[in-house]
Amino acid sequence: MISPSTKLYGLIGYPLGHSISFYIHNAAFRALSIDALYLNIPIEPEFFSKAILGIKYLPIYGLNVTIPHKESIIEFLDEISEISNILGAVNTVYRENHKWKGDNTDFGGFLKTLEDLNLSSDFSCLILGAGGAARAVIYAVLEYGFKEVYLTNRTYERAEKIAVEVKKNKNFEIKVIPWEDREKISEKVILINTTSIGLDGKETPWNGDFKKLVFVYDIIYNPKETPLLKLAKENNVPYKNGLDMLIYQACLSWEKWFGFVGPFEVMKREAEKLL
């Protein structure tokens, strides 16, 4: 029930038609009897500056930020977390001590799923993609303790740029391999897809030998089983989609908004109804 004292939260990005954040956060508010409402706030890139300046002065207590605004939001914030600074992206905004602050829970969301899976850090990781999601995944993989990380991207230079950043920030040597050589890797690896390949339900970023793969993680969550995950299943390779990462990053936003982590099971049940 909305009341005059209902606190507003929301998601900014463009477009937002695909997002399930509205449903999972509001389901969690209802489950915990929190007098709050979560809204979709679509902002076209050309109007972003004016819109965000207005939002700063409205009684909105917290925001999630998605594509294409995760980077452009930073200049409008008073402070950002260390991980946001490293990743160059913010996905959670909150008010604290009269300041508008930013954090990145994509990193923590992926790290939490790795911890749940309890994968052996003795294996190497092969990460496909070099966008914003790849950055969060790479730093989570390093935090988890994997000793060897390979990175490949359709644009080689983008992968190289990330490798240089990681070397500077973490003193860790990522091995960059050309996209066309990704399936030639000789050792057994954990494959992590951070690209959009498979979002259409038709393509797969891996047509190589599945005997080389000890685990397949595709951060796409809709469709639930991408062509990559279907192939993993057919080849008896354990696999996971990106739904838990999505839910965990949403739950971790609550830590900034309310001082406690959001209800994972409630949010996941709601998400599964929609997918």
Curated annotation (Swiss-Prot):
GO BP terms: amino acid biosynthetic process; aromatic amino acid family biosynthetic process; chorismate biosynthetic process; shikimate metabolic process
GO cellular component, one term: cytosol
One MF term in the entry's GO annotations: shikimate 3-dehydrogenase (NADP+) activity
Reaction it catalyzes: shikimate + NADP(+) = 3-dehydroshikimate + NADPH + H(+)
Pathway listed: Metabolic intermediate biosynthesis; chorismate biosynthesis; chorismate from D-erythrose 4-phosphate and phosphoenolpyruvate: step 4/7
Keywords per UniProt: Amino-acid biosynthesis, Aromatic amino acid biosynthesis, NADP, Oxidoreductase
Record flagged with keyword Membrane: no
Residues that coordinate or bind NADP(+): E82, G129, A130, G131, G132, A133, N153, R154, T155, Y156, E157, R158, I219, G242
InterPro entries reported in the protein's UniProt record: Aminoacid_DH-like_N_sf, NAD(P)-bd_dom_sf, SDH_C, Shikimate_DH, Shikimate_DH-bd_N, Shikimate_DH_fam, Shikm_DH/Glu-tRNA_Rdtase
Binding site for shikimate: S19, I20, S21, T66, N91, D106, Y221
SUPFAM superfamilies: Aminoacid dehydrogenase-like, N-terminal domain, NAD(P)-binding Rossmann-fold domains
Annotated active site: K70 (proton acceptor)
EC number(s) given by UniProt: 1.1.1.25
Pfam families (UniProt xref): SDH_C, Shikimate_DH, Shikimate_dh_N
Function: Involved in the biosynthesis of the chorismate, which leads to the biosynthesis of aromatic amino acids. Catalyzes the reversible NADPH linked reduction of 3-dehydroshikimate (DHSA) to yield shikimate (SA).
Subunit structure: Homodimer.
UniProt similarity note: Belongs to the shikimate dehydrogenase family.
Protein name: Shikimate dehydrogenase (NADP(+))
Biological source species: Dictyoglomus turgidum (strain DSM 6724 / Z-1310)
